[in-house]
Amino acid sequence: MSSVKRSLNQEIISQFHYSAAEGDIAKLTAILSHSPSLLNETSENGWSALICDRSIVNKSRQTALDIAKFWGYKHIANLLANAKGGKKPWFLTNEVEECENYFSKTLLDRKSEKRNNSDWLLAKESHPATVYILFSDLNPLVTLGGNKESFQQPEVRLCQLNYTDIKDYLAQPEKITLIFLGVELEMKKEFFNYAGEISKEEEDGLVAWFALGIDTVAAEEFKQRHENCYFLHPPMPALLQLKEKEAGVVAQARSVLAWHSRYKFCPTCGNATKIEEGGYKRVCLKEDCPSLHGVHNTSYPRVDPVVIMQVIHPDGTKCLLGRQKRFPPGMFTCLAGFIEPGETIEDAVRREVEEESGVKVGHVQYVSCQPWPMPSSLMIGCLAVAVSTEIKVDKNEIEDARWFTREQVVDVLTKGKQQAFFVPPSRAIAHQLIKHWIGMNPNL
């Protein structure tokens, strides 16, 4: 008898939920007039008539959104698809430890307060201890370090030049781009005497670094005189060969040099501009230009924010990875895209994932970021939890997208290219996001 009563009760709950999904107000009112407690009754999936956890999946691995789409409940599907945030899934950690990605570490203190001190900058330009790094077409000058007789892979190191090496270029300011990068983090208590060139009163113990951009003709002439040096090219993946702290310096220099190469003329009026503030500002030469009054972002180096996200299946056991046509065969990575004006990080993640893969995203959690000097992006790394699972790739955006199991991803990270697919190298934030997801499992 009790089982019959239970079945009848379940049938009433089922009818009530069906009416709620249909939006049948009249029937809902009639049912509630007899059994108001049904408002709090939940189905086998844990859903009530008023709310549902979008991250819960049934035995067929379907979410509430998947089911609404399957049965054609467009109004419900629209509500579920466009609801933001939601309850944090159980498989996401409460705290995310701060980490430094490649291109994030540096040897330098930027000393931005010195950029307006033209006398100090001029003195540092000719200081014997000052370090210059040379660029041509945004490619840094490097050399191979280590013992030539060693069987180990030689290190790619920046060529650290001094004033004597580059003074001829400084004499032709119209042909170069000079950027003050900062000073070494460790102050030098005492410099060598340098034959008495610098008085003790003038010495501050700060070792300044500058980036110097020269044209291709000058670059070829320099290489002929310094056969052990070469310009690192192409930027990807060549820049990933640098030591971590030197890579951070290159990221800073390359991004600012790229900005100068693209903004030689005033974005406000179109007239020519000149470089000021140690290379961190371009000033219009037209006296009545509006950009000369107040602070304008067009006068300073720009950074383009990009979201890059590890999309996790609603049940936490799979991740979504995609690939573009230009990728090496077999490489899959996290989805990514530029943030649009007036858009939050979370909304950008949801929009980009849906545009590229057709998958809807609910909860978004920030993990870490990475400067990406191609030419000047900031990759904002996030975890994103899907609320739908069906993939519909936009071929105009990406070539393919797939769900990969945790086991597949672990095999790729541990066995590399022996597998059917591979992911970006460890110095890319995509790799670190994938590892972060894998690391959520305490058994790994």
UniProtKB/Swiss-Prot annotation:
GO terms for molecular function: magnesium ion binding; NAD+ diphosphatase activity; NADH pyrophosphatase activity; NADPH pyrophosphatase activity; RNA NAD-cap (NMN-forming) hydrolase activity; zinc ion binding. Pfam families: NUDIX (PF00293), NUDIX-like (PF09296), Zn_ribbon_NUD (PF09297). The keyword NAD applies. A motif (Nudix box) lies at residues 337-358. Mg(2+) 2 binds at E352. Residues 301-435 form the Nudix hydrolase domain. ANK repeats lie at residues 11-40, 60-80. Disulfide bonds: none annotated. One of its GO terms (biological process) is NAD-cap decapping. Transmembrane segments: none annotated. GO terms for cellular component: peroxisome. Mg(2+) 1 binds at A336, E356, E397. This is NAD-capped RNA hydrolase NUDT12.
